[in-house]
């Protein structure tokens, strides 16, 4: 296609979630309440962790960093989704679409590395308890969280630069409720194999290597736990990792269903539904998984709410 005959797309139209007529206002209210709950829930975790001296430890520093990530993450997707429920035509500019894609990809990549960092923290706590405070220092925690964000945002910058260089000159109807890589590239009218290859390589690096680090950490944790002679001690040691392991399982399972499904079971409707669950529901579930099983956090929450200390 000759360059002079190409009219580049400057605006995308988001199809949004499939809804029955008349249900969009109910869905708007449902997702709005969910969004507000995520904000309040994660802000509360951050405030409680930073205001309670008993929680000034590496595990809770990682937890507050994860809550900050969840707030940013859900705020990248949900406002545009809510707008889509109220408007007949859900438009987003090309720059706005690339910006949304950049932050979505960056935050997913950051969470991969942050979960691996949290797995390392649990590994040291279980396998080297006497050296824990020497190995996992506040400085190291800051470096691990900083590295998670820097690596996630840098890799995503490269991915989005390649994707934004692709020419979009045909249909501008994006069959999704937010700007994701696969539905965007389906609208390309020039060869996008280079952008697709770069995306695959960088996604492999940022997803697989942190996952391998997490698996390796839990392999050593499992071996250490199995060496504990008493069943009570064994359960107590492993229960400290149960919340993080649950979040890791939910996170990677959702990613696999979203991006690594066989073509035979792939459909835009199911993909959008899984994406909606992943982008809105998991930011609610993750803090609950971490906090509801944690006695120290529940005690700090009761103290913050003026309900007094639990009896010992």
UniProtKB/Swiss-Prot annotation:
<feature type="topological domain" description="Extracellular">
    <location>
        <begin position="76"/>
        <end position="99"/>
    </location>
</feature>
<dbReference type="GO" id="GO:0005829">
    <property type="term" value="C:cytosol"/>
</dbReference>
<feature type="topological domain" description="Extracellular">
    <location>
        <begin position="259"/>
        <end position="271"/>
    </location>
</feature>
<dbReference type="InterPro" id="IPR017452">
    <property type="entry name" value="GPCR_Rhodpsn_7TM"/>
</dbReference>
<keyword id="KW-1133">Transmembrane helix</keyword>
<feature type="transmembrane region" description="Helical; Name=4">
    <location>
        <begin position="140"/>
        <end position="160"/>
    </location>
</feature>
<feature type="transmembrane region" description="Helical; Name=2">
    <location>
        <begin position="55"/>
        <end position="75"/>
    </location>
</feature>
<comment type="function">
    <text>Odorant receptor.</text>
</comment>
<feature type="transmembrane region" description="Helical; Name=5">
    <location>
        <begin position="197"/>
        <end position="217"/>
    </location>
</feature>
<dbReference type="InterPro" id="IPR000276">
    <property type="entry name" value="GPCR_Rhodpsn"/>
</dbReference>
<comment type="similarity">
    <text>Belongs to the G-protein coupled receptor 1 family.</text>
</comment>
<keyword id="KW-0675">Receptor</keyword>
<keyword id="KW-0472">Membrane</keyword>
<protein>
    <recommendedName>
        <fullName>Olfactory receptor 6B2</fullName>
    </recommendedName>
</protein>
<keyword id="KW-0807">Transducer</keyword>
<feature type="transmembrane region" description="Helical; Name=3">
    <location>
        <begin position="100"/>
        <end position="120"/>
    </location>
</feature>
<feature type="topological domain" description="Extracellular">
    <location>
        <begin position="161"/>
        <end position="196"/>
    </location>
</feature>
<dbReference type="GO" id="GO:0004984">
    <property type="term" value="F:olfactory receptor activity"/>
</dbReference>
<feature type="topological domain" description="Cytoplasmic">
    <location>
        <begin position="47"/>
        <end position="54"/>
    </location>
</feature>
<keyword id="KW-1003">Cell membrane</keyword>
<keyword id="KW-0716">Sensory transduction</keyword>
<feature type="topological domain" description="Extracellular">
    <location>
        <begin position="1"/>
        <end position="25"/>
    </location>
</feature>
<keyword id="KW-0552">Olfaction</keyword>
<dbReference type="InterPro" id="IPR000725">
    <property type="entry name" value="Olfact_rcpt"/>
</dbReference>
<feature type="glycosylation site" description="N-linked (GlcNAc...) asparagine">
    <location>
        <position position="5"/>
    </location>
</feature>
<dbReference type="GO" id="GO:0004930">
    <property type="term" value="F:G protein-coupled receptor activity"/>
</dbReference>
<feature type="topological domain" description="Cytoplasmic">
    <location>
        <begin position="218"/>
        <end position="237"/>
    </location>
</feature>
<dbReference type="InterPro" id="IPR050516">
    <property type="entry name" value="Olfactory_GPCR"/>
</dbReference>
<feature type="topological domain" description="Cytoplasmic">
    <location>
        <begin position="121"/>
        <end position="139"/>
    </location>
</feature>
<dbReference type="GO" id="GO:0005886">
    <property type="term" value="C:plasma membrane"/>
</dbReference>
<feature type="disulfide bond">
    <location>
        <begin position="97"/>
        <end position="189"/>
    </location>
</feature>
<dbReference type="GO" id="GO:0005549">
    <property type="term" value="F:odorant binding"/>
</dbReference>
<keyword id="KW-0812">Transmembrane</keyword>
<feature type="transmembrane region" description="Helical; Name=7">
    <location>
        <begin position="272"/>
        <end position="292"/>
    </location>
</feature>
<keyword id="KW-1015">Disulfide bond</keyword>
<feature type="topological domain" description="Cytoplasmic">
    <location>
        <begin position="293"/>
        <end position="312"/>
    </location>
</feature>
<keyword id="KW-0297">G-protein coupled receptor</keyword>
<feature type="transmembrane region" description="Helical; Name=1">
    <location>
        <begin position="26"/>
        <end position="46"/>
    </location>
</feature>
<keyword id="KW-0325">Glycoprotein</keyword>
<dbReference type="Pfam" id="PF13853">
    <property type="entry name" value="7tm_4"/>
</dbReference>
<feature type="transmembrane region" description="Helical; Name=6">
    <location>
        <begin position="238"/>
        <end position="258"/>
    </location>
</feature>
């Amino acid at each position: 296609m000759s360059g002079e005959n190409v009219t580049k797309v400057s605006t995308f139209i988001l199809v949004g979630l499939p809804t029955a007529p008349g249900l969009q206002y109910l869905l708007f209210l449902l997702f709005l309440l969910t969004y507000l709950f995520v904000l309040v829930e994660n802000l509360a975790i951050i405030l409680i962790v930073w205001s309670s001296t008993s929680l000034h430890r590496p595990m809770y520093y990682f937890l507050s960093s994860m809550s900050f990530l969840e707030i940013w993450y859900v705020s990248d997707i949900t406002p545009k989704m809510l707008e889509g429920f109220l408007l007949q035509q859900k438009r987003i500019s090309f720059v706005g679409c690339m910006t949304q894609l950049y932050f979505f990809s960056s935050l997913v990549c950051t969470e991969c590395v942050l979960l691996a960092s949290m797995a390392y923290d649990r590994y040291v706590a279980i396998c080297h308890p006497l050296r824990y405070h020497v190995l996992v220092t506040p400085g190291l925690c800051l470096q691990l969280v900083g590295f998670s964000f820097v690596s996630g945002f840098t890799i995503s910058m490269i991915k989005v630069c390649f994707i934004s260089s692709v020419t979009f000159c045909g249909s501008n109807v994006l069959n999704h409720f937010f700007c994701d890589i696969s539905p965007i590239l389906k609208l390309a009218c020039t060869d996008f194999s280079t952008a697709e290859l770069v995306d695959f390589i960088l996604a492999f690096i940022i997803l697989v290597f942190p996952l391998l680090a997490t698996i390796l950490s839990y392999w050593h944790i499992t071996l250490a736990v199995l060496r504990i002679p008493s069943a009570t001690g064994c359960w107590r040691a492993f229960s400290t990792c149960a919340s993080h392991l649950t979040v890791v399982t939910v996170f990677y399972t959702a990613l696999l269903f979203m991006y690594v499904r066989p073509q035979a079971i792939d459909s835009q409707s199911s993909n959008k539904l899984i994406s909606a669950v992943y982008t809105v529901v998991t930011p609610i579930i993750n803090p609950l998984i971490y906090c509801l099983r944690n006695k120290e956090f529940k005690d700090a929450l009761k103290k913050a709410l003026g309900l007094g200390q639990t009896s010992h």
